[in-house]
Amino acid sequence: MKQEKKKFDAEVGKILNLMIHSLYSNKEIFMRELISNASDACDKLRYLSQSEAELVAGDSNFKITVKGDKNNGQVIIRDNGIGMNKEDLIENLGTIARSGTANFLKNLSGDSKKDNMLIGQFGVGFYSSFMVADKVTVTSRKAGEDKVYVWESEGEGEYIVSSSDREFSRGTEIALHIKKEEDSFLDHFRLKHIVKSYSDHIAVPIYFFDEGDNNEIQLNSASALWTRSKSEITEEQYKEFYKSLSYAVDDPWVTMHNKNEGAIEFTNLLFIPSSKTYDLFHPDRKRRVKLYIKRVFISDENIDLIPSYLRFLRGVVDSEDLPLNISRESLQHNNVLEKIKNAITKRVLGELKKKKEDSPDEYNNFWANFGGALKEGLCEATTDHEKLLEVCIFRSALHNKMISLDEYIKGFKEGQNTIYYLSGDNPDKLLSSPQIEGLLSKNIDVLLFTDTVDDFWVNVNSEYKGHTIKSATRSDIDVDQATSSSEEKNKDDKKSDDEYKSLTDYFKEVLGILVKDVKISKKLTSSPACLAVSEAAMDIRMERFLIEQKQIANASAKNLELNPKNKIIEKIFNDLKANNKNNEELVKLIFDQACILEGEPVADTGAFSKRLNDIVQKAIL
């Protein structure tokens, strides 16, 4: 086949330009990426060979070889993994079929340390070769096929693909033509040091070919780290494994290395990152826990190994009870896998509960990073909601710190049986909301919910350990009776309603269909009015979210609660007693103000502005 010259995808061209003109200080990460790719290639073929043994006939011992060729100025990485044919080379090296490249470019921060981590996270690690090489030559033969193909590029917008007559066994060889200014990478001592730094956890043996002695030296132990005893593994080895597996620059916050024995046997080596992962809420996010069966890599995609709300976990799970020849499709609804998932979930939640109690400051940082994802589990039917709620923390309006639901309950006032919350986008704005001023004045705490998911999970978790979870926007909250009997409360409610009937009727008459009802508030202490919803109605913030998502068309009419102790409301009431009904514009302004404070749209902004101007004008003249 004659040579075919092709242009890189535009996005790949941007990546190449970035790598070629890289200012990254840690350029040796190219070795981490290429070794990781070679290991993946061996893992893929090992898996396929369980059902197609002929693919590894005559060469079933997988290995990776690294060679420094000083005479020709090359670093060569060779594996006997699955290999690539012409189509694979074009798809994998010439284009990015997935959204990885675009996301990579979008997430670049300008911080070289963080951007180094992104290189591997977004699947563009191969291109890091151009940090140190001015030309890259890839020779490959796919397992089960005879033809050998060569891919070559200088990284300047195009590449060449051609067939080759070279005698070449299965696998892939990457030859990096090292830049003159990067020739220190040809030094054997440095090469071996770099490979050892990034490879000890790799389960495939990695050899260094010493051209002087004409022999190969194994550089890694080639035993999967998770199969070793914890006492044999240093903290540094755990960290390096985590960083290589996760393409991370941070250290893990929590390391869980456990061997589960009994009815179901498996080993897990799991990490909770100390920094927020870039794709936590990305639509194309992946769960990054790899499944192995008897040390054979099976998959890290499309398997239900961990619940979605624990997707921040990194690591591996190695099962002894699943058959090696199981298909990926069969893993979707597998009883053994479901038991492993349940055991891991229980273990992780137990570890989080311990951390919450023992290291609250560290836990606050974890929660800021991953709490939003964790709370998604409260919306899932299969979740043990109470166990999950035990590890949730929320901002306390009364104490201005993060507390758990159990801590909130310990702070109940005498006779209190309800957990109050208020949801919104900004905790500072929530603190000044009229909805909670009465509760706080009585030292009744309110939890501030600021994640979108909060509005969903409270709809399916209306209580915790026998205590009702209630929004402070509900109409039936009476701060004076919050810790008293319902019988006393009903008597006082009737008295207030009768006493101020003329006031509420007047507001109803003026506002008409803009309100569902007008009531005397039992929760306001200083503000003139607030919007509220009945017990059965949708929470105000939840309704607003559904309108934004076009799930419902229009906002429903809300109740308007009035504070008779407020001077403005008192003035309107006294005017009514004097048969003066000339406060229509003031009534409308009070309603508009209540809407604004709740984040609701004002029906007529022009009229609102005029009313406000008129009142200000009267005040200064």
Swiss-Prot record:
Keywords: ATP-binding, Chaperone, Cytoplasm, Nucleotide-binding, Stress response. Residues 1-328 are annotated as: A. Homodimer. Molecular chaperone. Has ATPase activity. Pfam families: HATPase_c_3 (PF13589), HSP90 (PF00183). Residues 478-498 are annotated as: Disordered. It is found in: Cytoplasm. Disulfide bonds: none annotated. PANTHER family: HEAT SHOCK PROTEIN 90 FAMILY MEMBER (PTHR11528). Residues 329-544 are annotated as: B. GO terms for cellular component: cytoplasm. Residues 486-498 have a biased composition (Basic and acidic residues). GO terms for molecular function: ATP binding; ATP hydrolysis activity; ATP-dependent protein folding chaperone; unfolded protein binding. This is Chaperone protein HtpG. SUPFAM superfamilies: ATPase domain of HSP90 chaperone/DNA topoisomerase II/histidine kinase, HSP90 C-terminal domain, Ribosomal protein S5 domain 2-like. InterPro entries: HATPase_C_sf (IPR036890), Heat_shock_protein_90_CS (IPR019805), HSP90_C (IPR037196), Hsp90_fam (IPR001404), Hsp90_N (IPR020575), Ribosomal_Su5_D2-typ_SF (IPR020568). Residues 545-621 are annotated as: C. Belongs to the heat shock protein 90 family.
